[in-house]
C-alpha cells in the first residue's frame, strides 16, 4: 500500500469523523485554505507526502553443537528495500500515479541493499559462559557508494548461584541514515546525501538475581558514539540540516526490581520499579541539536497491576523524567527542558473464564494517560498531549 502524510488535514471524514470544519482545500494558486476560519497553510506546503515501499528480507542461520561445552553458529542476512515517493529519493524520470488518490503522482525514488555475514561461538563450562562473535556488513546506499562495517562482540556470564549471576558485554553497533535524513527538503528541513553511518562501542557490566517471585537487576554501562546523525540548526538560520555532528560518550547506571504473583487471586498481580541515570561528555558545539545530544539524564518508572475483584483490575504507572539539552521556542530563544512527571491509569474488566462460555480471552478497558494533565515538552518545540482518555474492547480467538 501507499502511505499518505498530511501536515494539514485535507480529507474530510477520515476515520468516520466529520472533518468539514478542519479540512483544507487546495486553491487554483496551489495554496491550501480552510474556509471555516480563513486560515492559510504555510507557503512551503505543496500537498501531502506519499511514500510506497517494498522490502525483501532473507535470514539464514546454521548452528552446530560440537559437544556439551562448545556451540558454533554462522549465517547471513540480506535486506533490500526501495521507496517511491513525491518527496524522498532522486528523480528517476518516470511518473507514477498514486494508487487510490486521483490527481497525485510520485516521481522520486531510491533503493538500498544491505548484506551481513556473522559468526558466533559459545563456550559453557560449569558456572562460566563466554560468547564471542563478529559481523561483517556491506551497505549499498542510494548514491551508489558502498561501505563495509565490522562489528565484533563479546559476552561473559558467571553464575554466582543457581539464581544469581554477573555478566559483562562489549560490542560495536552502527546506524545508517534513513531516506528522510538523505532526501527530505521541505518546511525548513534539509537532508544531505553526504551523511556517513554513525557507529558506537557499547560496554555493560551487570548483576541479575531471582529470589522467589522477585527479579532484581543492576548495571553500569558506557557508550562511545561518533559521527552521530542529527538535525541541527544554527543561530540566525531557520533551516535544520541533517548532519554527522560529533562524538558523544555516555556513562550511566540502571537497575530495577520486578514482582510477579504466582496466583491469579493475589491482590497485587505484579509491580515493577525501574530507574536509569546517565551523564554525557561531548565537545562544545555552535549549533542546536534536535535529539542526538538531548539524552535522558534521569528516568524513573514505577507501575503495578492490582486486582479489584469481580474480574476488574487496575494498572497504574508513574514516570519521572529529566532530559538535558534545549529546544528553540517560537520566538527563537533557547529553552532548557524541564523535568516532568506523568501519571497513567488503566481500568479493565477481564473475566477469568472468558466470554461465550468458550474461554475466549476478553477485556474491556478505559485508559487515562497523563491523568494530571501535565504540560511538558520532550522533543523539540512541540508540547506533548495533555490528559488523554480512551476506551475499547479486546478479543482473542484461539
Where are these regions (language model features)?
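C-terminal beta-signal and adjacent terminal beta-strands/loops
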Residues: 273, 323-327, 347-398
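Residues on the lipid-exposed face of transmembrane beta-strands in outer-membrane beta-barrel proteins
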Residues: 58-64, 117-123, 154-158, 205-209, ...
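Face-selective signature of the C-terminal outer-membrane beta-barrel domain
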Residues: 1-145, 159, 217-220, 266-274
